[in-house]
Amino acid sequence: MSTISRQQYADLFGPTTGDKIRLGDTSLFVSIEKDLRTYGDEAVYGGGKTLRDGMGMDNELTSIGGAPDLLITNVTIIDAVLGVIKADVGIKDGRICGIGKAGNPSTMPGVTPSLAVGPATDAISGEHLILTAGGIDAHVHMISPQQAEAALSNGITTLFGGGLGPTDGTNGTTITSGTWNLEMMMRSFDALPINVGLLGKGNSSGMKPIVEQIEAGAAGLKVHEDWGSTVGAIRTSLEAADEYDVQVAIHTDTLNEGGFVENTIAAFDGRTIHTYHTEGAGGGHAPDIIRVASYSNVLPSSTNPTLPFGINSQAELFDMTMVCHNLNPKVATDVAFAESRVRPETIAAENVLHDMGVISIISSDSQAMGRVGESWARSIQTADAMKQGRGKLPEDNADDDNFRVLRYVAKITINPAIAQGISHLVGSVEVGKFADLVLWEPAFFGAKPKFVIKGGMIAWSLMGDPNASLPTPQPVIYRPMYGAFASALHKTCITFASQAGVANGIAERYGLQRLVEPVRNTRAITKNDMVRNAHTPHIEVNPETFAVMVDGVHATVAPIRSVSLGQLYFFS
């Protein structure tokens, strides 16, 4: 048997078990935990390589016979469910069909049956790439359709939220109010190459206005303080959600007019709810909304403008709040409202609670204090900042950061998918799931993806001058690919809706051409279902200093002065 050095092997086939990969310019390193391929029989595309007729490709295998449509070879997978592994990944009919060893079973041992390669199979060389699930942003103000382009450019493939363009209501709240608006927004998203789920308005003490939105296809409900986050509205929306199996997201009452955090928690009555702005900087009971993160029925999230906590966070947030919530800087009470939300102490605690796995989800709050194209970047930046500010996590090995990285990856992939009832289709790199996948060069991990695959087709990609002699000449920018056009888009993108809406035939009634899939299993889940982010410690907030105590320990970290994945990667 011939042998080669580990360095030569990595040059040819990429890293393998025990090898480490640095993520971008961060201090984070991941180590490959296991390799599912067979050494010496790697499936490699190209001139003189193994995926040729009669070698690594079975010349008798047809598409009908099971050959994958697309194979990603020798790729490093970073996935909150699978861990950090090396494998070939196959896609067929828009779904992940296999993860393991690809090739020709007639000439290669150990080929995974669903990864037998035939003439019908195309290939992406993943030897020096990282594969993740597409990101899921569960807090989107749908202010402009161009958000889809910005989101895809940072590896986000699913948007959950609401709105109907740049209305003041949309600028302030993630809600698509009413049946006609829901229909029109679903019709509009039919042409955008990204998955979507729309949230109806839950701000009603009466049941009928809520029910009609769910039956019109709302994939969830949103209760927002700008429309009145009253105890009555909370209770009614949760009752409707329990009946129809949709999730409720809430932005609580900053001014404590309708009650304090204790009253809101009592209104939850142990029922599952997704709390937006759990840290409070984006809104919610001042100063102690962060306490809800200690309850098992609460699925807590926070948004990317306060992640990671930096020296400019406080100044930036004040102006954001004034603009987004229709406040007047000439009115003293409006200024006081904004100032009550921007508390460096609770922002610092938010970062620590993310690192501890107490806050489970990271989202954007797009164009309404947050940036839809930065959730992956902010997640990895925060992981890096916390490593530098807090040191190694006890769960991590001495020479890698696998647990910490996977904890943060979970916050923007599988956990929002579980919270919104779509994890049976998206959110992880698992066989049978919709092939929403992102490929990254390690040097650009979290900042700039190389390819974004939607439903098995490349929909978004870095691409050079289309008139050039190669794909690589400048200007290399993000461009829509074939998966983002015409009816291919309809077969590779999903509109998520309530089960009641799907049963009511909204696809036909609204003339939707995209896939329409129901959300499910949103009511029986708890914090314990949040992958790698299920911690429920006791949390207290000092009402005078705003210091946050977690199991009696002050949860704080100094604001960072410089950030990874920053100006080295982006002009500013």
Curated annotation (Swiss-Prot):
The modification N6-carboxylysine is found at residue 222. One of its GO terms (cellular component) is cytoplasm. Signal peptide: none annotated. Binds 2 nickel ions per subunit. It catalyses: urea + 2 H2O + H(+) = hydrogencarbonate + 2 NH4(+). Belongs to the metallo-dependent hydrolases superfamily. Urease alpha subunit family. This is Urease subunit alpha. It comes from Laribacter hongkongensis (strain HLHK9). The gene is ureC.
